[in-house]
Amino acid sequence: MIKIGSSVVKEQKKIFNQCVFHPTDAVEDAWGKRIIDKMAEDGAIDTVRVYAMLEDIAYRDEDGNLAYDFRTSDTRLDYLTSLGFNLVIAYAGIPDCITSKVGGRTSVAKNKTRYKGKMWNGNPPDDYAEWEEICYQYTKHISERYGERVNGWKFHCFNEPDVVNFFMGELDDRKEVAKRCAEYLNLYEHFVRGVRRANKTVMVGGPALACVIDFLECFLNGVKERGLEMNYIAVHTYGTDPELLNSGEETLSVKAMMKRVMDRVRVIEKCGFSHLPIVMDEWGASSHGFFNSEECKILMFRETEINSAYFIRFIKELTDASLPLENLMICLSGQHEMVEDFTGFRNFFTLNFIKKPIYNAYVLASKLHTGVVECENNVEYLTVLPTKSDKGGYAVALAYAKEDFSPEIAEITETVEFSENIVDKKITVWCIDGECANPYRLWQRMGEPRIEGELIKVLREEGKMKPKCSFCATENAVDLKLTANAVYLITVE
């Protein structure tokens, strides 16, 4: 029995429907627009993180002076803002024109290059004044172009400077933390100066940490010592990685994810920054969104109901922890790598634009309210996140899963009972499980045939998030059939 109370015990900001759209330079492409359009239409995402892609903007003119071409950048941001998205912008990467260092270019992708044959430049600028000027010119341009709405966005300096893939690849990211951090602090200081010359109010932050906790501590202490402005702290958190999954050292686990979250929080508190909001501008049940089943067979969970159950359990744990979290952004970094439909990349849609269960979980999460109500739950393995609107409506998310999301779990029927009288109100029940809103499982049951023609239509239809049932309540309870890794949403209106 699950009993849903009527009293709001805490308020939770609507921060869960956010993503990193990757690669940023797919925003101007038809396939990228198709995904973005659908996210906006379904209300699955309201805030998007993109790279500024300063390497597409800054160049040298014939006299060797810095010059700027904002047209491609404008195309991207115009499109995103036209659909009403709020933006988080990472000022990255380093334009080739301000660093003379040879090497230091990486793909951070399955392929030898990034999207459209590009490479990531992780070398520091030769002259930080030029980096500052580029940050100033970019901020000035978008502040003038988009006006007051920019003040609701967030800007941060670079991406994952603590690891070799993104910054100063010649330095060991575990043994040479201090040297790497000192260089990044220079980058951050001039980023803040450049932004503030153009805009006095937009929120600025860093470091968009990947995983090196010592780097985070070094950075925060450096910010304090240098007296630098910082309005929020950006960190990335992944529950595990493919290498640990392959070795059996770790399994999928929200507890492991929350341990990594709290490791970051403890450093933030230790360094005296507990007053600042936290922006988790990348998350995933596993890192390496550009890896798939070729590198790690367990990554096939990304195609299944497991990923949606993980998401619901994770946001419940974050809600319970009452952290100063302002953004939670799933990173969709496998989108451009696909050559088949179901291979385990970290994205919302397959190659043929078939919705995955994780996408549908985001659609359901968008229906949650800001008021979290009391709840009694004595069902083993069941996570319940009950919310209430200021108009008295309810939206209750549930996930039934073991800690490691194993399929070996008893199938049960449980009753969700509301303490408030809901008779005559409209009840709608949505479900994601092995048989509902799950194209991959349907394809498996069909014998994994070649995906083409009519089958694409069938799988797209299966991927649509439709109510399992909708009815006028005649009692204050709803019965649910719980199967392994099932997700439910119950709304009362």
Predicted features along the sequence, with ranges:
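Mature N-terminal, pre-catalytic/accessory segment of carbohydrate-active enzymes
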Residues: 1-44, 484
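Short, acidic/polar
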Residues: 26-40, 137, 141, 214-223, ...
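Substrate-binding cleft and catalytic face of glycoside hydrolase catalytic domains
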Residues: 43-252, 288
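A structural motif corresponding to the C-terminal end of an alpha-helix
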Residues: 76-86, 141-151, 190-202, 226, ...
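Substrate-binding surface in catalytic domains of secreted glycosidases
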Residues: 237-271, 291-305, 311-314, 348
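Aromatic/acidic polysaccharide-binding cleft in carbohydrate-active enzymes
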Residues: 280-409
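Carbohydrate-binding surface patches
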Residues: 379-445, 484-491
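C-terminal beta-strand-rich structural cap/linker in extracellular carbohydrate-active enzymes
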Residues: 450-493
